[in-house]
Amino acid sequence: MKTLYSLRRFYPVETLFNGTLALAGRDQETTGFAWWAGNARLINLSGKLLGAHVAHAGLIVFWAGAMNLFEVAHFVPEKPMYEQGLILLPHLATLGWGVGPGGEVIDTFPYFVSGVLHLISSAVLGFGGIYHALLGPETLEESFPFFGYVWKDRNKMTTILGIHLILLGIGAFLLVFKALYFGGVYDTWAPGGGDVRKITNLTLSPSVIFGYLLKSPFGGEGWIVSVDDLEDIIGGHVWLGSICIFGGIWHILTKPFAWARRALVWSGEAYLSYSLGALSVFGFIACCFVWFNNTAYPSEFYGPTGPEASQAQAFTFLVRDQRLGANVGSAQGPTGLGKYLMRSPTGEVIFGGETMRFWDLRAPWLEPLRGPNGLDLSRLKKDIQPWQERRSAEYMTHAPLGSLNSVGGVATEINAVNYVSPRSWLATSHFVLGFFLFVGHLWHAGRARAAAAGFEKGIDRDFEPVLSMTPLN
């Protein structure tokens, strides 16, 4: 039997609010949803829903382009990016555009091009969104069956899933191609303090790549966030892109197995909840990555990580006091532990003092001073280079402290410089967004499961507490 496409609603859902209010000719009586239910009015209008999604993409890309150009217009090449409140230019610089040795910006034109390309793209998407929302067919099933769908059609849904996976895989390979063939990417570990280089010797060993997933998430291990060389990052994208593309082909060619048909809820709201759950995980992982990882997010552009700034302070004062004659190998601190250097529980030589808790930091300016057993005393006495001193002094004074209202510095310091690290911004915003996406996942999953079980009726307004309360006036 052919499914009827014209059924506006086949969900046992009532959203009782204000039936008299009509919006754009779609009132609650005909759609079953009040104006504030957003795209729920479009659940079975595939053409209009396409318009909403394309327009949303246009808004996202417009923000990217406009913000990109705003950052270019305000950029001062003499100051580090992280001192200028930039969040987009550091991403472009990390991809190797416009920067040279040490992360110095040598050309801002690629950044301008990026902004203009995004603005032009957003105009195309905006036009498409308005067209499909206002002028195009309400439903695609009749005129364009390839793009049409019914939410309950499990085979079509997995085909759409497959197409999305292939697009994600292509996205992963774009980074691979940039790193291999199109000028390379910025490597903060390049000798002498970072440079743009092509990544030639990819890590493709599955034991290495998937070993990250099996690592502990705690200190010294750090799960996938502990990745600290670009060969592993780009090799991981080869694996990820391949898995996404092959998984996409698999989902296009196959129908869901019986266990999947039984286990999952097959409705528009269920798919929304799955997507929100996935985005929530992305948000939390991005939060950890930008906060702790200084390879994927080089400190030259994003500022130092918290542990990095702390270790930089210990290093800076070790250098100063050593010049003033202190024996940094044996000086005792106020607690009886080493003042500058001490041993970790497993025997490595680490920086002493409060920064001991950040013993597992790895940073390009510090690693040359390590030996087989942690920090090497003879290297600390003879091998410290001026660029390492400059880098650590700079990072010491740019710790990622500060709050979302842009009040920078240590909370107890009355004269703090008003500096907020992009790491603070990006980590906090992605954590908060990840959290709200998770709440949305729970909300829509609960509604979708209830609707599938047949007992979702919206809120019962007959016995609402407010009805028995005294009117405000």
Curated annotation (Swiss-Prot):
Keyword match Acetylation: yes
Keywords on record: Acetylation, Chlorophyll, Chloroplast, Chromophore, Manganese, Membrane, Metal-binding, Phosphoprotein, Photosynthesis, Photosystem II, Plastid, Thylakoid, Transmembrane, Transmembrane helix
InterPro entries from the UniProt entry: PS_antenna-like, PS_II_antenna-like_sf, PSII_PsbC, PSII_PsbC_sf
Pfam families named in the record: PSII (PF00421)
Propeptide stretch(es), residue numbers: 1-14
Annotated residues for binding of [CaMn4O5] cluster: E367
Cofactor remark from the record: Binds multiple chlorophylls and provides some of the ligands for the Ca-4Mn-5O cluster of the oxygen-evolving complex. It may also provide a ligand for a Cl- that is required for oxygen evolution. PSII binds additional chlorophylls, carotenoids and specific lipids.
Chain positions with Phosphothreonine modification: T15
Highest taxon listed in the record's lineage: Eukaryota
Main location: plastid
GO molecular function: chlorophyll binding; electron transporter, transferring electrons within the cyclic electron transport pathway of photosynthesis activity; metal ion binding
Function summary: One of the components of the core complex of photosystem II (PSII). It binds chlorophyll and helps catalyze the primary light-induced photochemical processes of PSII. PSII is a light-driven water:plastoquinone oxidoreductase, using light energy to abstract electrons from H(2)O, generating O(2) and a proton gradient subsequently used for ATP formation.
Subunit structure: PSII is composed of 1 copy each of membrane proteins PsbA, PsbB, PsbC, PsbD, PsbE, PsbF, PsbH, PsbI, PsbJ, PsbK, PsbL, PsbM, PsbT, PsbX, PsbY, PsbZ, Psb30/Ycf12, at least 3 peripheral proteins of the oxygen-evolving complex and a large number of cofactors. It forms dimeric complexes.
Similarity comment: family membership: Belongs to the PsbB/PsbC family. PsbC subfamily.
Protein name, UniProt field: Photosystem II CP43 reaction center protein
Organism: Gossypium hirsutum
Gene: psbC
